Amino acid sequence: MGRTLENKQQIVTEIKSLLNDSEMAVVLDYKGLTIKEMSDLRSRLQTTNGICKVTKNSLMRKAIDGDSNWNDLESLLTGTNAFVLIKEDVGGAVKAIQSFQKDTKKSETKGALFEGRLLSNSEIKEIASLPSKEVLMAKIAGALNGVATKIAISINEVPSGLARSLKQHSEKPES
């Protein structure tokens, strides 16, 4: 028994909602993966706030229809696809996918869409090499803190230098 029209509409609505919350979509060919391996991929993605969704290409096509951010995804909608929808930690999720692919040697990345732009496999690998958002924020905070510390030391040094000069001048014997 096939899916009812109402059921298909619910799936399309769910996919649209997931896409609205996502920053990036990675399309994987999942042919040959077992249920256990798909569960493994899903659990790896949970820590990075990514979702692996297996759905028919026709339903994904309906979900992206008219959405300029996701329209280019249509060129990847052939064959057996699993869609990894990434909400926040894009680099971490791509690392999780690559780690999974390295371990299973079964799944292939067809492509990805990030901020309305199709990415090649080499660009996807570059994203994986980026540090996480938290690491970048820590680096920026450290750099800003260093600048603030130097400014505070410089500001404090002017009155201290003036005080030392006045003290030296007052202790100098009058000639």
Swiss-Prot record:
Domain of life here? Answer: Bacteria
Q: List the disulfide bonds.
A: none
Q: Name one Pfam family in it.
A: Ribosomal_L10
A single Gene Ontology biological process assigned to it is:
translation
* CDD domains (UniProt xref): Ribosomal_L10 (cd05797)
Which Gene Ontology CC terms are recorded? ribonucleoprotein complex; ribosome
Per UniProt, the keywords (alphabetical) are: Ribonucleoprotein, Ribosomal protein, RNA-binding, rRNA-binding
Could you give a GO molecular-function term held by this entry?
A: large ribosomal subunit rRNA binding
State how it assembles: Part of the ribosomal stalk of the 50S ribosomal subunit. The N-terminus interacts with L11 and the large rRNA to form the base of the stalk. The C-terminus forms an elongated spine to which L12 dimers bind in a sequential fashion forming a multimeric L10(L12)X complex.
- Function text: Forms part of the ribosomal stalk, playing a central role in the interaction of the ribosome with GTP-bound translation factors.
Member of which family? Belongs to the universal ribosomal protein uL10 family.
Entry protein name: Large ribosomal subunit protein uL10
Give the species this sequence originates from.
Prochlorococcus marinus (strain MIT 9312)
